[in-house]
Amino acid sequence: MASGVAVSDGVIKVFNDMKVRKSSTPEEVKKRKKAVLFCLSEDKKNIILEEGKEILVGDVGQTVDDPYTTFVKMLPDKDCRYALYDATYETKESKKEDLVFIFWAPESAPLKSKMIYASSKDAIKKKLTGIKHELQANCYEEVKDRCTLAEKLGGSAVISLEGKPL
């Protein structure tokens, strides 16, 4: 932990809940998180779950039409964040679901914030074991096009993301 920032237990619990796809009742599935944002605590000592910045599986098709577009809109204009996004995508062979770790560091974020988030990234990644895909973005142009995420998930083999053809 180069920055000395700790990862809160809440972050690890959310990650484990998103990672493990146990057989659940339809009600439990609706409560699963599709996307979450993590931020630094006020004192900059802990990485915590950002309150109210999440999409639940049950929201998709109800209050959320396109989870990826909604997720991109949750990212702040002028500050950094870490995020977990549970991507549902299709290749020519099969349907897949994978967690993607996203490091959001917009160019308009304060330099100090970018430095703390960049130096704390390894700390959070070490705690979130088993993530296959990572995306780092510095502006909305890099995330608003779902092809950027599809490229990370499997390149040209990916034919749709969140049910939307590429």
From Swiss-Prot:
Family matches, as CDD domains: ADF_cofilin_like
Alphabetized UniProt keyword annotations: Acetylation, Actin-binding, Cell membrane, Cell projection, Cytoplasm, Cytoskeleton, Isopeptide bond, Membrane, Nucleus, Phosphoprotein, Ubl conjugation
Position(s), cross-link Glycyl lysine isopeptide (Lys-Gly) (interchain with G-Cter in SUMO2): K132
Pfam families in UniProt: Cofilin_ADF (PF00241)
Protein's GO biological process: actin filament depolymerization; actin filament fragmentation; actin filament organization; actin filament severing; cell motility; cell projection organization; cellular response to epidermal growth factor stimulus; cellular response to ether
GO cellular component, one term: filopodium
Residue list for modification Phosphothreonine: T25
Bilayer topology: Peripheral membrane protein
SUPFAM superfamilies the UniProt entry points to: Actin depolymerizing proteins (SSF55753)
Post-translational modification: Inactivated by phosphorylation on Ser-3. Phosphorylated on Ser-3 in resting cells. Dephosphorylated by PDXP/chronophin; this restores its activity in promoting actin filament depolymerization. The phosphorylation of Ser-24 may prevent recognition of the nuclear localization signal. Phosphorylated via a ARRB1-RAC1-LIMK1-PAK1 cascade upon active ligand stimulation of atypical chemokine receptor ACKR2.
Record bears the keyword Acetylation: yes
Residue positions where Phosphotyrosine is found in the record: Y68, Y140
A GO MF label: signaling receptor binding
Chain positions found as N6-acetyllysine: K13, K73, K144
Residue list for modification N-acetylalanine: A2
Subcellular location: Nucleus matrix; Cytoplasm, Cytoskeleton; Cell projection, Ruffle membrane; Cell projection, Lamellipodium membrane
ADF-H domain location: 4-153
InterPro entries: ADF-H (IPR002108), ADF-H/Gelsolin-like_dom_sf (IPR029006), ADF/Cofilin (IPR017904)
Subunit structure: Can bind G- and F-actin in a 1:1 ratio of cofilin to actin. It is a major component of intranuclear and cytoplasmic actin rods. Interacts with the subcortical maternal complex (SCMC) via interaction with TLE6 and NLRP5. Interacts with C9orf72.
Family: Belongs to the actin-binding proteins ADF family.
Free-text function comment from the UniProt entry: Binds to F-actin and exhibits pH-sensitive F-actin depolymerizing activity. Important for normal progress through mitosis and normal cytokinesis. In conjunction with the subcortical maternal complex (SCMC), plays an essential role for zygotes to progress beyond the first embryonic cell divisions via regulation of actin dynamics. Required for the centralization of the mitotic spindle and symmetric division of zygotes. Plays a role in the regulation of cell morphology and cytoskeletal organization in epithelial cells.
Name of protein: Cofilin-1
